[in-house]
Structures are given as structure tokens and as C-alpha cells.
Amino acid sequence: MNLSRRSWMTGALGLGLAPASSLPAVTEPYPRSGKALRVGLAAYSFRNHFEWSRGKKNPKFEAGEKAMDMPGFIEYCARLGLDGAELTSYFFPPDCEASYFTDCRRIAHVNGVQISGTAVGNNFSHPKDAPERVEQIAHVKQWIDYASLMGAPHIRVFAGAHPKGVSPEDAEQNAIDALAETAVYAAEKGVFLGIENHDSITTADRLLRIVRGVDSPWVGVNLDSGNFIADDVYAEMTASAPYAVNVQLKTEIKIKDSKEKAPADLERVVKILKDTGYAGYVVLEFEEETDPYEHVPPILEKLQKWCG
């Protein structure tokens, strides 16, 4: 059954799960009953400490250092008292057997940690007749299978950068079409696709236009607090948060018309999430080129306080 997000909302309305108001012609934010914010950590924060990166030996991994792996990362999250661990796809060993993913699920469960999701580096902006499009859709579907094995409810996906010769308008429609196709498979597996404000998506307007274009209850926003480029990035977050199915929090924000970044007001971001009714994971994705073992725990301690 191809259930659109709008028809799902209508069903939720009939069951008393959504506000008793008429549904407009555009996709609505998710109806939410809970308000809990759960703190998690993205494996990307330790990108220089994994032995593997995108199917190859990690060039930034220092010989002699004890390598981080996914089971070890899950246990690290447990020691920090976190609710969730986001297992970025880039850092899995190549050619993993199904047992590796189910082992991650087992280790997470016995340590009281939920695998909050995973993240892939796809590009859905290729034209329909391009072989790259077929490859990218197959790649995301494969990771939907892996997410299902791990019990992960969410995958971060990209629209992708514009391929050469493809207009911004066509690239956007290509992304919508590819997401819609992939969403049917994701729904069968019970896995959300969260489209991130990344690459060509720098504003809430474009981000939400894509989500609404897909119109699936299994496709929402993966809100990356560090990737908006606008006069007021906090306003962009406020507009996007009601549609979020996952939040990745970064310690810096981009400055419009500049290559520089500024420190993010993380407490303000958490307040935006609460004020807009977001419920779900708030995952720290630490991108600074400093030692995450030293700098990540104090940030998470503050997040746990603010999200509590």
C-alpha cells in the first residue's frame, strides 16, 4: 500500500491523534503526543578514530592507536549515559555480514542504548535515466535493510549536489522522485528517511519543499543545526523542526557570505526544539578537528541537562 503522508494524517485525525482541524493542501508537521528529547552521539564525531572509512582503511587513523569500531562506539555511548547511538555508515567494515548488524543491535540492547539511526552519503539529484541514480537508490535501499537489522528507526539521506548539466529545479525534482521511490521500500521496513539540509539545501524553504513534494509519512527532515546558510539560521531551524524525524546538533553555525563559522548557541537550539514540539533524538555530531574524547563529554553533559 502506498500510503501518502497526507492520508496518514487524515487517519491519525480520525483516531484523535492529530489536532481536530482541516488539513491544508500541503503536508502537515508530524502530530506528536510526547515531548521527550533523547540525547545521542553520532559516530561521525570519532571519524578519525575508526579503522575503516567509506570502505577503505581510514587515512586519518593513526597506527598504534586502539581503533574505534561500532560495538566499541555503542559501549562508549552507554558509559556516557546516552539514550542513543547514531552509527554512521561510512565507518562500518567493508562487506559486513548480517551478523555484524544484528550484533550491534544486541550490544546496544544489553547496554541500554538505542541505535537511533544511521547515515548515508548518497546523491539523489541524478536524472532518471542516469545509471548513477539506479546505483544511489540501490545503495540507500541496502542501508534500509541494514537499519532494519539493527533496529534503527531512521536513516539520514541527502538530496545531493547538482550533477553537471542539471539545473537546480531539475535536480530538486529528481531528488523528490528518488526519495518517493525509496520511501516505499523504507515504509515496508519501518524505517524513516530524514532528508538533511546539506549540499544544495541551505534553507528551510527548499528543505520543506522537498519533504512536501515526497508526501510520505516515512520521510521527514533530518535537521542539521550547522548547515543552514541564511541571515537568521535559528529562524530556519524553527521552521524546519516541526517536520523533523531526527536532529543532528553541531557546535558551530555557518555565516552567510563567509567561509567562517561561529559558535552555536546550543541551549537556544534545544529551546527551539522544545518550543516547536519536537520529540525524538538530539544527536551531537562533533565536527571540530579537536580530540573528541576530551571535548565531546562536556558538551553531552550540558545537552543532557538542557534536554531533560
Where are these regions (language model features)?
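A structural motif
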Residues: 82, 152, 244, 278-279
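Acidic/histidine-rich catalytic cores of soluble enzymes
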Residues: 53, 84-85, 176-272
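Acidic-and-aromatic substrate-binding clefts and catalytic sites of carbohydrate-active enzymes
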Residues: 88-100, 124-128, 163-167, 198-204, ...
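Helix C-cap/helix->beta junction micro-motif
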Residues: 110-111, 150, 188-189, 217, ...
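N-terminal pre-domain/capping segments
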Residues: 2-149, 170, 177, 216, ...
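Conserved active-site loop/cleft motifs that coordinate metal ions or position small ligands
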Residues: 280-287
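Active-site groove signature of glycoside hydrolases
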Residues: 147-166, 189, 194-198
